[in-house]
Each structure stands twice: as structure tokens, then as C-alpha cells.
Design a protein with these regions (language model features):
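Flexible hinge motifs at transmembrane-helix junctions and intramembrane kinks/re-entrant loops
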Residues: 1-11
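Structured cytosolic domains appended to multi-pass membrane proteins
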Residues: 13-154
Length: 154
């Protein structure tokens, strides 16, 4: 049980070609990664026991991405609970990513998740423009800004 809590299941979501939605897809499914966009889903609460592991995992995914990540979308739908320690760690990582020019967006965030972000002052830093009702809406905003290839549309 301790291992399950400290190293929870997660996924990098990919865009399915048949419906354009982002899913946790097997390698043999008809889905693609969008260049410059990393969509991450955690299948657990974000708490003291797993915060370090999850933040290291996110750091690793961003560092290994090619091309480099421009936007990191956190699919927060399964993060039904987050404690203060985890919120603080998330805030630290968010600031690191911001310093590196990586925009962090939050999709489908439950109320408890948003409340913990507010407690550590992160909801003001992220801003309402960085919260989306779904991963699809967030990814659409990314593609509107950068195009489907991830290069600047401006």
C-alpha cells in the first residue's frame, strides 16, 4: 500500500487521431503527441507521501521532451485531494518551469485542488487564464497559439 501511495500511477496523455481528444493510450493506439505540449495525468491524490516522486517525474518528463515543452497541462481530474506540503512542492516546481519559459496550465481541477493552490498563493500566480474546464480546451488554446505543429502561429 505504501508503494502505491508514494509512487502512484500516472500517464502522459496523447491526442487520439479519431476524435482529437487526449487519452492515456497504449503505444499501439492511433494517437500522437503534440510537439511542445506535455499533458500529464496523475491517478491519485497529491499528498506529502508522493509529492516528491510526482514532482521529480514531471521534471524528468519535461527535461526528456523533444522538442522542448512550451506548455505543461496538468489533467487534475483525478487529484481529488492535495495537502499543503504537496501544494508547496507544486508551487516550487511551477516557479521553476515559469523561469524556464514553460507555461503550466491546469485542466479539470476539482475544488479541493484549487483550494490548496490558493492556500500557497499559487492560484494568483497561475491566474484564471491558466485554468481550463478540460484538457481538450487547454490543448485547443495551445494549438491556437502555436499551431498543431507546436511552432509559433504569430
Amino acid at each position: 500500500v505504501l508503494v502505491e501511495i508514494s509512487r502512484p500511477d500516472d500517464a502522459v496523455l496523447r491526442k487520439r487521431l479519431d476524435d482529437g481528444k487526449f487519452h492515456d493510450c497504449r503505444d499501439d493506439e492511433n494517437a500522437v503527441a503534440v510537439p511542445g505540449l506535455l499533458v500529464y495525468r496523475l491517478y491519485a491524490p497529491l499528498i506529502f507521501a508522493n509529492a516528491r516522486h510526482v514532482m521529480m517525474r514531471l521534471r524528468s518528463l519535461v527535461d526528456e521532451a523533444s522538442p522542448p515543452v512550451k506548455w505543461l497541462i496538468i489533467d487534475a481530474q483525478a487529484i481529488h485531494d492535495m495537502d499543503l506540503t504537496a501544494a508547496q512542492r507544486f508551487a516550487e516546481l511551477h516557479r521553476e518551469f515559469a523561469d524556464e519559459g514553460i507555461d503550466v496550465k491546469i485542466a479539470d481541477a476539482p475544488r479541493p485542488f484549487r483550494e490548496e493552490l490558493a492556500k500557497v498563493g499559487l492560484s494568483e500566480e497561475i491566474g484564471s487564464q491558466d485554468f481550463f474546464v478540460s484538457v481538450k480546451k487547454a490543448a485547443d488554446a495551445f494549438e491556437h497559439k502555436y499551431g498543431a505543429s507546436g511552432s509559433s502561429a504569430v
